[in-house]
Amino acid sequence: MATLFTVARPSSLLYVSSINPSKTFSPSISLKLNSLSFSFGYRPKPLRFSKIRSSLPSESESESDLDASAVTDEWGEKPGDANEPDSQPDNVTVNVITDEWGEKSGPELEESGTRFMESDPPRNEDEWGGEIGGETEADAGNGSAVSDPTWELKRCLADSVYGTELGFKAGSEVRAEVLELVNQLEALNPTPAPLENPELLDGNWVLLYTAFSELIPLLAAGSTPLLKVKSISQSIDTNNLIIDNSTTLSSPFADFSFSATASFEVRSPSRIEVSFKEGTLKPPVIKSSVDLPESVGVFGQQISLSLLKQSLNPLQDVAANISRALSGQPPLKLPFPGNRGSSWLLTTYLDKDLRISRGDGGLFVLAREGSSLLEL
């Protein structure tokens, strides 16, 4: 460094002391007001360095020293809490859950294997606290659960046909609704081969609804003021291959019943060929008392029948005598001519409560006698 301040012709203002190479060179400058001079002095200043320690462990440090060093987070706290247990059971797994900020939530203990062995299974409850699909649900009279979708469809079908006089008074909207429900039930048919399940097919079936055009005159007669269609039913006997259709008409004075007996042949597991043989007209059942309504509707006008009812009371004894006389008479049988009584019947839905059949362009919805569907 001394060579930087050496000049060929030193000025008298510049005084350079002799330089000892063995000493540390430290320049100093002094400025006087009268003259400008530079002086260089040798003031050794030892260099001091702060102690630098590497963050990496040296080979001399043992593993125990590394384990003893504490690692802290940004708040100066240790991640391991002193209150946490030192060890966990063998059958317990600790799940550390962090939130969206990276902070730990409370650990959840999950037992392996038999966590729910001693606890009850979770209950499936609705918003009112009731179990869904449990054993506590109310069952229908036929043993079907109310929440069963098939039972709900059957209940809706029974509600839709109620008050339609077996379909005679059903409007276009009701007919469309009934047809839609029938299609849904047919898609869920639990018995695709009804003729192979006689325990379900056999028995007495009560008509709920029909769209069969040949029954319209009969249903129209039941819409008269003093005559009602009391019931239309069908009895099936697969052992003897016999079907019996029965109709009962009710009047204030008597009940009239007639039936049609047919034999059938099995064409497929769900279809039969029906051949009607004869019709039977049973003797009327005379009522012990005249059962007149209070009024009847004729052309939109309500006509009172109270006076007629009072005048017929003396005739009740005569009606009882006629009933006893006719009760012992045999039924009148009428054969069907030719093949006019032939038809076919296809069962598209069958269970222990409901049967849906189609035949000759007609639709028949029937409920088993004694079913809860008849009470809806």
Swiss-Prot record:
Where is the major localization of this protein?
A: plastid
Where does this polypeptide localize? Plastid, Chloroplast, Plastoglobule
Q: Per the record, GO CC terms?
A: chloroplast; chloroplast thylakoid; chloroplast thylakoid membrane; endoplasmic reticulum; plastid; plastoglobule; thylakoid
Q: Sorted alphabetically, which InterPro entries does this protein's record hold?
A: PAP, PAP/fibrillin_dom
Q: Which UniProt keywords apply?
A: Chloroplast, Plastid, Transit peptide
Q: Where is the transit peptide?
A: 1-53
Further comment:
Simultaneous down-regulation of PAP1, PAP2 and PAP3 leads to impaired long-term acclimation to environmental constraint, namely photooxidative stress imposed by high light combined with cold.
Q: What is this protein called?
A: Probable plastid-lipid-associated protein 3, chloroplastic
Q: Where is the composition biased (Basic and acidic residues)?
A: 117-126
Q: Report the protein's function.
A: Probably involved in light/cold stress-related jasmonate (JA) biosynthesis.
Does Chloroplast count among this protein's keywords? yes
Region annotated Disordered, chain positions: 54-146
Q: Which family does it belong to?
A: Belongs to the PAP/fibrillin family.
Q: What is the lineage of its organism?
A: Eukaryota, Viridiplantae, Streptophyta, Embryophyta, Tracheophyta
Regions of biased composition (Polar residues) lie at: 85-96
Q: Which Pfam families match?
A: PAP_fibrillin
